[in-house]
Amino acid sequence: MIRAFDAVSLPLLRWLDPEDAHRLAIQGLKLWPPVKPRPDDSKLAVRAFGLNFSNPVGIAAGFDKNAEAPDALLRLGFGFVEVGTVTPKPQAGNPRPRLFRLERDEAVINRMGFNNEGAEAVLRRLAARAQYGGIVGVNVGANKDSDDRVADYVKLIETFAPLASYFTVNVSSPNTPGLRNLQQAAALDDLLARVIDARERVRAAAGDTPVLLKIAPDLSLGELDDVVHIARSRRVDGMIVANTTLSRSPTLRERTKMNEQGGLSGRPLFRLSTRMVAETFVRAEGAFPLIGVGGIDSGGAALTKIRAGATLVQLYSALVYKGLGLVESIKADLASTLLRTGRDSLAEIVGADAPMITAEEWPV
């Protein structure tokens, strides 16, 4: 069914404006039949952040910003779904056009600007689907016009704690002016201290909801030293590596679009984000698991991220070019690799290549 859907939908969606195509995809998923996915190979099961994942392949934040279709995505075979980025108040984001396909590079540039319907609307949808279970994380951010951005994060932690499987603190989007400044040492330490404190205040009522930190791939190694040290000292539960990049490789072929302002994702991000996963893994020293994101478009790419240090992986841009069937393809490739190598779980290979990757010349 998914293959047939991809065969029909992908060519049609390519004719549409990227943002209109995305909106249509969300509407289509809301109509997806309530069919249970095939059971995952037991060898793909992962335990991380105190949660049990049936498989390691998730969908990254940005696809389902307003929690309109998390259950359809879970039925398509994703091991987990991350909704958002959600801000306390609704906001329209940046003016259109703000989403661009770089088709020859299998990449996307976006400058969306945290467009979303706000916490109240997302909370209502998550409450309505709570009975269905599944791992649904909430990616939280600050409103562009906020006078106290840290207070925005705290408010969202308190609001969503009863319903979120985990939180992602997003301080790495390049499309909200000044947001990435929250990755600087003093600001990040204050933010994480207040976020973790908020989580502790609601623990009795909401449980111990894991808090993850999502970082940019454009950090220097010195900056990464500080970020990981602070994340460890503030006892975050994990990190997501990495968000979109502001860098533009000279090898990009879509010369007319490559200089559009915004964050670049997709295949050209793969090498940089994989290096950042490995660098973070080495610095974390097992303190917490990582989710690897950036340019994953095949089972081989997912395996490379895992061997670099990712316990879980997330996709988004590759779905634009490969379709929803990519999820099952990646899982099949990972299971086949485990069978062929005689391993019982992916945990046995997490970070196996990190020392080799980090020994390569920097920058990549």
UniProtKB/Swiss-Prot annotation:
It is an enzyme of class 1 (oxidoreductase). Its EC number is 1.3.5.2. The keyword ATP-binding does not apply. GO terms for molecular function: dihydroorotate dehydrogenase (quinone) activity. It comes from the Bacteria. InterPro entries: Aldolase_TIM, DHO_dehydrogenase, Dihydroorotate_DH_2, Dihydroorotate_DH_cat, Dihydroorotate_DH_CS. GO terms for cellular component: cytoplasm; plasma membrane. CDD domains: DHOD_2_like. SUPFAM superfamilies: FMN-linked oxidoreductases. Substrate binds at K65, N110, R111, M112, G113, F114, N170, N175, N243, T244. FMN binds at A61, G62, F63, D64, K65, T85, N139, N170, K214, A242, G266, G295, Y316, S317. It is a peripheral membrane protein. Its main location: membrane. GO terms for biological process: 'de novo' pyrimidine nucleobase biosynthetic process; 'de novo' UMP biosynthetic process. It holds the Pfam family DHO_dh. Its cofactor is FMN. It catalyses: (S)-dihydroorotate + a quinone = orotate + a quinol. The active site is at S173. Gene3D superfamilies: Aldolase class I (3.20.20.70). PANTHER family: DIHYDROOROTATE DEHYDROGENASE (QUINONE), MITOCHONDRIAL, DIHYDROOROTATE DEHYDROGENASE (QUINONE), MITOCHONDRIAL-RELATED. Monomer. This is Dihydroorotate dehydrogenase (quinone).
